Amino acid sequence: MASAARLTMMWEEVTCPICLDPFVEPVSIECGHSFCQECISQVGKGGGSVCPVCRQRFLLKNLRPNRQLANMVNNLKEISQEAREGTQGERCAVHGERLHLFCEKDGKALCWVCAQSRKHRDHAMVPLEEAAQEYQEKLQVALGELRRKQELAEKLEVEIAIKRADWKKTVETQKSRIHAEFVQQKNFLVEEEQRQLQELEKDEREQLRILGEKEAKLAQQSQALQELISELDRRCHSSALELLQEVIIVLERSESWNLKDLDITSPELRSVCHVPGLKKMLRTCAVHITLDPDTANPWLILSEDRRQVRLGDTQQSIPGNEERFDSYPMVLGAQHFHSGKHYWEVDVTGKEAWDLGVCRDSVRRKGHFLLSSKSGFWTIWLWNKQKYEAGTYPQTPLHLQVPPCQVGIFLDYEAGMVSFYNITDHGSLIYSFSECAFTGPLRPFFSPGFNDGGKNTAPLTLCPLNIGSQGSTDY
C-alpha cells in the first residue's frame, strides 16, 4: 500500500492542474507552476495571462520547458508498461494499473490512481464487479424490454403484410365488381337504347301509317272534287240544252260537297330520351350555385342565402352598375366556369314563365337584346305556361310530355355542350346545345319571367345537391 501511495503521489505531481491528466510537453511559468504547454497557451490566448493556481500574471513568451517533469511522466509510463502488456483490456490506459473501481458519476472504469486523482476523488466509487452485477441486471431488464418491442415490431410487420395482402385482394375484388357492374350496366344501356329506338321506330311507323291513310282519303276527296270541277267546267262550255240537263242536281252536289276533316295536326312523340341512372351520374358533377346580386335586375328579390329569386312588386333603389341587367328580370350565378363539367338543378314549380341556362360573362346587360346562342346565351324557356323553346336562332320548339317541376342543367365546357333535363320525368333529355364555341368564362343564367298579372309570382329556387367529387371548384 505504501508503494501504491507513493505512486499515487508521483502521478499527482505529474498531473496538469488544468486538464487533470498527466503532463504533455510540460512547461513552467514565472511563478514556478507547471502545466501542459497546450493548456497554458489556451489560457494565455484567452487574454487572462494569470496563473490558474496562484493567480499571478505571466507572459507566454517566458514559458520554459520542464524536462524534469517530462522525464517523470515517461518513467511512470515505463514502470506500468510491463503490467499493461497482455492485459491491455483490464488496465488503465494512462497509469497501467488494473481497473477495479467504477465511477458512478462519470460511468467509467478506473484504476486506483485515477480514483485518487483530483478529477475523481470526490466521486462515488463502487467495486468493478459490483457495478458490473448491477448494470448486468439493468442491461437484462433493458434487453428484455427491447426484445419485447422487437417481438411487437415483428408481430406488426406480420400484421401489415397480412393487411397489405388483404387490401390488395379487396381492391382486386372491388375492381372485378366495378368492371362486372359496368359491363352489366353497358349491356343494359345497349338493350335500353335498342328498346327506346324500337319504340321510336314503332311510333314512326304508326304515325306514318296514319298519315298515309289520311293522305289516301285526301287523294280520294281530291279526285272526287276534280271530277265535279271537270263536270261543271264542261257544262259551262256546252250548249244550253246540255248545260240545263240535270243542272239542279249538279248544283246541289257542288253546294253540298265539303272537304272532310282529316285532323292533320303534327303528331307528338310518345317516347322520350330517358337514360337509366343518368341523374345519378350527372349529380357526381354537382356544384353549389349562388346568385350574384350585382347582376340582378332592380325588380328582382334574392333570398338571404342567394339561392332563390322572384320578381318583386316595386323597383329597388340600388346602384345601376355595369354588371346589372336593367331591362329584363335576369340575374347571373356568382360562379365563373373556365373548364370542366358542372351540374345544377332549379325548381320551377308553379311558374308559368322562366328562362334557364348559361351565358358568356361578357353578354350584354343593358337595353333590349335577344336570348340566343348567337348572342352568347345557351338557354331554354317556358312562356304562357305551355310553350317551351330553346334559344337557337331561330327558336326551336320543344315538346314535353311531362311539364318539368325541376330542371337540370349540365355544362361540359371542353365538349362545348349545354344540356337540359326534365328531372320530373325521370331525368329525360329536354334539349342539348352541342358543338358550342365557348370562349372565356361562362356563368349560370336565370330569369323568373314577368309576373303576368300575378299568375307567375312563384320563385326560381336552386335545388340542394350533394356536391360530387368531379364537380370543379374553378369559379
From Swiss-Prot:
Post-translational note: Autoubiquitinated; does not lead to its proteasomal degradation. Deubiquitinated by USP4; leading to its stabilization.
Swiss-Prot/TrEMBL keywords? Cell cycle, Coiled coil, Cytoplasm, Cytoplasmic vesicle, DNA-binding, Host-virus interaction, Metal-binding, Nucleus, Phosphoprotein, Ribonucleoprotein, RNA-binding, Transferase, Ubl conjugation, Ubl conjugation pathway, Zinc, Zinc-finger
**A single GO molecular function term of this UniProt record:** ubiquitin-protein transferase activity
Residue spans annotated as Zn fingers (B box-type) read 92-123
Q: Where is the B30.2/SPRY domain?
A: 268-465
For the modification Phosphoserine, which residues carry it? S266
Instruction: Give the stretches traversing the membrane.
Output: none
Give the primary localization class. Answer: cytoplasm
UniProt signal peptide: none
Q: In which pathway does it act?
A: Protein modification; protein ubiquitination
GO CC entries: autophagosome; cytoplasm; cytoplasmic stress granule; cytoplasmic vesicle; cytosol; nucleoplasm; nucleus; P-body
Q: Its quaternary structure?
A: Homotrimer. Interacts (via C-terminus) with IRF8 (via C-terminus). Component of a SCF(SKP2)-like complex containing CUL1, SKP1, TRIM21 and SKP2. Interacts with CALR, CUL1, FBXW11, HSPA5, IKBKB, IRF3, SKP1 and VCP. Interacts with SKP2; the interaction with SKP2 does not depend on an intact F-box domain. Interacts (via N-terminus and C-terminus) with DCP2 (via N-terminus and C-terminus). Interacts with ULK1, BECN1 and with ATG8 family members, including GABARAP, GABARAPL1, GABARAPL2 and MAP1LC3C/LC3C. Interacts with TRIM21 and SQSTM1/sequestosome 1. Interacts with IRF3. (Microbial infection) Interacts (via B30.2/SPRY domain) with severe fever with thrombocytopenia syndrome virus (SFTSV) NSs; this interaction activates NFE2L2-mediated transcriptional activation of antioxidant genes.
The answer to whether UniProt assigns keyword Cell cycle to this entry is: yes
Which tissues is this protein detected in according to the database? Isoform 1 and isoform 2 are expressed in fetal and adult heart and fetal lung.
What catalytic activity is recorded? S-ubiquitinyl-[E2 ubiquitin-conjugating enzyme]-L-cysteine + [acceptor protein]-L-lysine = [E2 ubiquitin-conjugating enzyme]-L-cysteine + N(6)-ubiquitinyl-[acceptor protein]-L-lysine
- A Pfam match is PRY
Where along the chain is Zn(2+) bound? C92, H95, C114, H120
Zinc-finger ranges (RING-type) = 16-55
Described function: E3 ubiquitin-protein ligase whose activity is dependent on E2 enzymes, UBE2D1, UBE2D2, UBE2E1 and UBE2E2. Forms a ubiquitin ligase complex in cooperation with the E2 UBE2D2 that is used not only for the ubiquitination of USP4 and IKBKB but also for its self-ubiquitination. Component of cullin-RING-based SCF (SKP1-CUL1-F-box protein) E3 ubiquitin-protein ligase complexes such as SCF(SKP2)-like complexes. A TRIM21-containing SCF(SKP2)-like complex is shown to mediate ubiquitination of CDKN1B ('Thr-187' phosphorylated-form), thereby promoting its degradation by the proteasome.
Q: Which residues form a coiled coil?
A: 128-238
- Look up the record and give one Gene Ontology term from the biological process aspect: negative regulation of protein deubiquitination
- Please state what the annotation says regarding this protein's domains: The coiled-coil is necessary for the cytoplasmic localization. The RING-type zinc finger is necessary for ubiquitination and for the IRF3-driven interferon beta promoter activity. Interacts with SKP2 and CUL1 in a RING finger-independent manner. The RING-type zinc finger is necessary for ubiquitination of NMI.
Under the heading InterPro entries, the entry gives:
B30.2/SPRY (IPR001870), B30.2/SPRY_sf (IPR043136), Butyrophylin_SPRY (IPR003879), ConA-like_dom_sf (IPR013320), PRY (IPR006574), PRY/SPRY_TRIM21 (IPR035831), SPRY_dom (IPR003877), TRIM/RBCC (IPR050143)
What induces or represses this gene? Up-regulated by isoform 2 of XBP1. Up-regulated by IFNG/interferon-gamma, with a peak after 2-4 hours of treatment in monocytes/macrophages.
Localization (cell): Cytoplasm; Cytoplasmic vesicle, Autophagosome; Nucleus; Cytoplasm, P-body
What's the protein called, per UniProt? E3 ubiquitin-protein ligase TRIM21
